[in-house]
């Protein structure tokens, strides 16, 4: 008997009555005589020979027209609507009882395809990550299959759209998966403008600082990238974009810790005060570091950094720059201490000379004898009193001016 496929959308066609082959389950239909009305046969066989029979003569005529009982609807005839009733009976005979779950086969196909896709992804991922050290975190399968629901396919058996993976998409799903992430995680290079603000955590999700300070793009599914702090990676990209040295770019994860930022800000403030440099001097001195893209900063920016009122991203971005300036300032300060004649020649201030009382009484005695001693006499007095020649000369000069003032005051 011809069965209509569940997955087919072809219209049902009524086969010719003479081409049907009689099966044993309808043998009761052919046991009745063609001329009888067969009132008891339908209850024992199937709905195909139900109460569509008309009069006795009409039933006989229908049986004779069927070729001697070769039609399963021998009793289905009548006056005007016998032909239509026979077609409806044949349709019910050909259609089996529908199962309770018409999507049973579809569910099995969905499960089989999902398992095949999972096997392909896991094998390919294990091959692509075999070079990673064993201390990395294990691969998480639940992050692999999120593209399964992005390939909707319409089932041929129903008009509803079921989110399954079409067989033609199985070969390209894995490529699409990596292709999508390859474009999504490209490191941005738009950090050459403003230093502050607009530091997004996603700028460096696919980048890491290499040994020479360059940014190296890594696969999006590398397990160690999932464990890194996004703020730390943003600082890495910032350090590379502004041309900082490689040792400044290779920051540790603890740099993103607010407690470490607070400790650095306090240490920076104390060192700045000890060096005798103002916040405005720090901001203007940053331009002398010759860092590409970093010019002078305002005094308020340095103040906000020291008071921890900047945003977390800006604190991370500004920390390596201020740290580089602090290292340069302390280096210059140490050089000034070791070689003061090179740096403090113009700024050196002469200390006030203080003469003790015994030396002062001796000088007054010499002044009473000779207010204007010669250069040789001044050198002898300086050697005797263990004073510098210039100090003795200046003292005699000042003492003469003092005597003039006293005489002028006495004359008035």
Swiss-Prot record:
SUPFAM superfamilies: Homeodomain-like, lambda repressor-like DNA-binding domains. Expressed in the heart, brain and spinal cord. Expressed in cardiomyocytes (at protein level). Expressed in brain and spinal cord. Expressed in dorsal root ganglion (RGD) neurons. GO terms for molecular function: chromatin binding; DNA-binding transcription activator activity, RNA polymerase II-specific; DNA-binding transcription factor activity, RNA polymerase II-specific; DNA-binding transcription repressor activity, RNA polymerase II-specific; p53 binding; promoter-specific chromatin binding; RNA polymerase II cis-regulatory region sequence-specific DNA binding; RNA polymerase II transcription regulatory region sequence-specific DNA binding. Gene3D superfamilies: Homeodomain-like, lambda repressor-like DNA-binding domains. Residues 241-412 are annotated as: Required for DNA-binding and transcriptional repression. A motif (Nuclear speckle targeting signal) lies at residues 174-188. A motif (POU-IV box) lies at residues 113-122. It is found in: Nucleus; Nucleus speckle; Cytoplasm. Its main location: nucleus. GO terms for cellular component: cytoplasm; euchromatin; nuclear speck; nucleus; transcription regulator complex. Residues 31-53, 152-169 have a biased composition (Low complexity). InterPro entries: HD, Homeobox_CS, Homeodomain-like_sf, Lambda_DNA-bd_dom_sf, POU, POU_dom, POU_domain_TF. Residues 29-96, 123-191 are annotated as: Disordered. Residues 54-70, 78-87 have a biased composition (Gly residues). Pfam families: Homeodomain, Pou. Residues 348-407 bind DNA. The keyword Nucleus applies. GO terms for biological process: axon extension; axon guidance; axonogenesis; cellular response to cytokine stimulus; cellular response to estradiol stimulus; cellular response to insulin stimulus; cellular response to oxygen levels; dorsal root ganglion development. The keyword Transcription applies. Interacts with POU4F1; this interaction inhibits both POU4F1 DNA-binding and transcriptional activities. Interacts (C-terminus) with ESR1 (via DNA-binding domain); this interaction increases the estrogen receptor ESR1 transcriptional activity in a DNA- and ligand 17-beta-estradiol-independent manner. Interacts (via C-terminus) with TP53 (via N-terminus). Interacts with DLX1 (via homeobox DNA-binding domain); this interaction suppresses DLX1-mediated transcriptional activity in postnatal retina enhancing retinal ganglion cell (RGC) differentiation. The N-terminal transcriptional activation region is sufficient to induce transcriptional activity. The POU-specific domain and POU homeodomain regions are necessary for DNA-binding activity and transcriptional repression. Belongs to the POU transcription factor family. Class-4 subfamily. This is POU domain, class 4, transcription factor 2. It comes from Rattus norvegicus. The lineage of its organism: Eukaryota, Metazoa, Chordata, Craniata, Vertebrata. The gene is Pou4f2.
């Amino acid at each position: 008997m011809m069965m209509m496929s569940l997955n087919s959308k072809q219209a049902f066609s009524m086969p010719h009555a003479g081409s049907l082959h009689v099966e044993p389950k309808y043998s009761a239909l052919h046991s009745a005589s063609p001329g009888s009305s067969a009132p008891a046969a339908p209850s024992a066989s199937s709905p195909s020979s139900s109460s569509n029979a008309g009069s006795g003569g009409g039933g006989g005529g229908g049986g004779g027209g069927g070729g001697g009982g070769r039609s399963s609807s021998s009793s289905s005839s009548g006056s005007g609507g016998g032909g239509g009733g026979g077609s409806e009976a044949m349709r019910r005979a050909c259609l089996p009882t529908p199962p309770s779950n018409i999507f049973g086969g579809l569910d099995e196909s969905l499960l089989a395809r999902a398992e095949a896709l999972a096997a392909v992804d896991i094998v390919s991922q294990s091959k692509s990550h075999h070079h990673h050290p064993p201390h990395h975190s294990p691969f998480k399968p639940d992050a692999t299959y999120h593209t399964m629901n992005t390939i909707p396919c319409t089932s041929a058996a129903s008009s509803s759209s079921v989110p399954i993976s079409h067989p033609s998409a199985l070969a390209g799903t894995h490529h699409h998966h990596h292709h999508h992430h390859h474009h999504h995680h490209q490191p941005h290079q738009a950090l050459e403008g403003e230093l502050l603000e607009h530091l997004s955590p996603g700028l460096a999700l696919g980048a890491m600082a290499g040994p020479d300070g360059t940014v190296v793009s890594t696969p999006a599914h590398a397990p160690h990238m999932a464990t890194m702090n996004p703020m730390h990676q943003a600082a890495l990209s910032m350090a590379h974009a502004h041309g900082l040295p490689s040792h400044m770019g290779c920051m540790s994860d603890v740099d993103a810790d607010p407690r470490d930022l607070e400790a650095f800000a306090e240490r920076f403030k104390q060192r700045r005060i000890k060096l005798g440099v103002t916040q405005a001097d720090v901001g203007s001195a940053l331009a002398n570091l010759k860092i590409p893209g970093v010019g002078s900063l305002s005094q308020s920016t340095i103040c906000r950094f020291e008071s921890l009122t900047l945003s977390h991203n800006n604190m991370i971005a500004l920390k390596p720059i201020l740290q580089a300036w602090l290292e340069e300032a302390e280096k210059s300060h140490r050089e000034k201490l070791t070689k003061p004649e090179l740096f403090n020649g113009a700024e050196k201030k002469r200390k006030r000379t203080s003469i003790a009382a015994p030396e002062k009484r001796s000088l007054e005695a010499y002044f009473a004898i000779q207010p204007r001693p010669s250069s040789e006499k001044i050198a002898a007095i300086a050697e005797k009193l263990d004073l510098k020649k210039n100090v003795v000369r200046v003292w005699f000069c000042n003492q003469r001016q003092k005597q003039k003032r006293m005489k002028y005051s006495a004359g008035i």
